[in-house]
Each structure stands twice: as structure tokens, then as C-alpha cells.
Design a protein with these regions (language model features):
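Short alpha-beta junction capping motif
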Residues: 98-139
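An acidic, glycine-rich "communication" segment
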Residues: 45-48, 63-64, 136-209, 216-227
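Bacterial N-terminal signal peptides
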Residues: 14-26
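Aromatic-Pro/Gly-enriched surface loop or interdomain linker
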Residues: 29-98, 104-105, 202-203, 209-236
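Alpha-helical scaffolding within the catalytic cores
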Residues: 34-36, 82-88, 110-116, 179-183
Length: 236
């Protein structure tokens, strides 16, 4: 296997962009608002977002990639506006330092997928996760898999004071479509946040073309949250 765990390709292509972003963050206490970058003509210059395929053919079909276009407009990060499908059990997953994971109904990961997920998150990867339609069966399966993959860690509530709620878009509170207050959960490994999870959903199904999902109790303004999560994952 090629040593792609450290995401050397990502670092090489984005070092200048990341340096600019860090300087912007250190110079401003307010959320980052910068002018859009110039058009990019090479995919090698773009940040990529993986769309995990797992447990056979489960994938994030109903997770909208619309937030990636918002991200490019609201920050100076150069981003591919489309998800890149990638199998969790494939070596190629390590080419994507940020990925989304979603689905419906119950599922079980293979042993290879569990090993890959653990390696991915412990060696530099970041995962944004939510079930389609707030699916309770999927939520239960996901939590079981996290316990198997990371027996020494647990999902914890992310406080609203966390930078993830202010890094680009100010998000003072989270509510579902019924205006009920909700929260995000996160997985930390050695002090590093490597996963953000919403059981209500951040899929932004209104912008997920070709998806028949009802959205369930999806969090309001999911694209703004996703922009923040992606930016945080890149900068921290």
C-alpha cells in the first residue's frame, strides 16, 4: 500500500491556502469572511470531499454537496463542488482528508471497513456524518459501529462555544425543523476532533437532487453548519 495516510498530496497542494487561512483566523476574532478565489482550472489545486460507500452499496446519496459551492464563495478555500464517491475499504479513501457518510436502515461494516475507518480517523481524516431522514435504525447501527471501531472513545456533545459554530458562519443555536433545540456530537482522538455527527441530520435534502428523502427532523440551515465543519477540519 502506498503511504497516503498522512495525506501528503493534500498538504502539497494546499499549503499556501492553509497558511493564508490561518493568518486570517489569527488576525480576526470574528468569523472568517473573505473574497471568493479566482477560478481554478486544475483538480490538483482543489480540496476534495469523499462520499463514503460502505456495507455493500450504502452511500450518501441524499447528502447534498451544495455546501461545497457555498464554501468556495464564503472563504478562500479552493474546493471541488462535487463529492467524490470512494469505497471505505479501498486505499483511495486516504486521498480524501474530509468525507461525508450517510444512509438509511440498519447496516454492518465489514472487518476491513472497520480497520480502514479507524486508520482514517486516527491518521488525519475527518468525517461528517448524519443519517438520511433522521433514520433511527441507521443511527443505532452507526453508534454500534463506532463502539466497535473505537472502544476507548465515545461520542460527546459539542458545546456551542466550540469554534465549529463560529469559524465562518455564526451559529448561536441549533434547532430541528420543528424548532426543537438540538446538538451535534463529536468524536475526539488524542484531543483532536475527527468526526461530527448529527442524528437529526445535516444532509440538506432540499438541495440533494434525485433524492426522495423527506429530510426527517433535519437541522435548520444545514449548509451553514457543513461549511463551518469543513473549514474547521481543514484548519485544525
Amino acid at each position: 500500500m502506498k503511504n497516503r495516510i498522512e495525506f501528503q498530496k493534500f498538504s502539497r497542494h494546499c499549503a499556501v491556502v492553509l497558511t493564508m487561512c490561518v493568518l486570517l483566523l489569527s488576525a480576526h476574532s470574528q468569523p472568517v469572511t473573505v473574497a471568493p478565489s479566482a477560478p481554478v482550472h486544475s483538480d490538483l489545486a482543489l480540496l476534495q470531499c469523499g462520499n463514503l460507500i460502505y456495507a455493500g452499496n450504502q452511500s450518501s446519496v441524499c447528502f447534498a454537496d451544495h455546501f461545497l459551492a457555498d464554501l468556495a464563495q464564503q472563504t478562500n478555500l479552493r474546493v471541488n463542488p462535487k463529492f467524490c464517491p470512494v469505497r471505505l475499504d479501498a486505499d483511495a479513501v486516504f486521498d480524501y482528508p474530509f468525507s461525508v457518510m450517510s444512509g438509511n436502515e440498519d447496516f454492518s461494516l465489514t472487518q476491513k471497513e472497520r480497520q480502514q475507518l479507524r486508520k482514517y480517523l486516527t491518521q488525519g481524516g475527518f468525517l461528517l456524518v448524519s443519517p438520511g431522514c433522521s433514520d433511527e435504525k441507521w443511527d443505532k447501527s452507526f453508534r454500534q459501529e463506532i463502539k466497535v471501531c473505537f472502544p476507548e472513545y465515545t461520542l460527546q456533545k459539542i458545546p456551542m462555544t466550540h469554534p465549529i459554530f463560529s469559524i465562518v458562519n455564526p451559529i448561536p443555536r441549533l434547532v430541528d425543523k420543528n424548532s426543537k433545540p438540538v446538538s451535534l456530537e463529536g468524536l475526539e482522538i488524542n484531543g483532536r476532533l475527527v468526526m461530527v455527527y448529527s442524528k437529526e441530520g445535516l444532509n440538506d435534502v432540499a438541495n440533494a437532487h434525485g433524492c426522495c428523502c423527506c429530510g426527517g427532523n433535519e437541522i435548520e440551515g444545514p449548509a451553514k453548519v457543513n461549511v463551518n465543519v469543513f473549514t474547521y477540519a481543514v484548519l485544525y
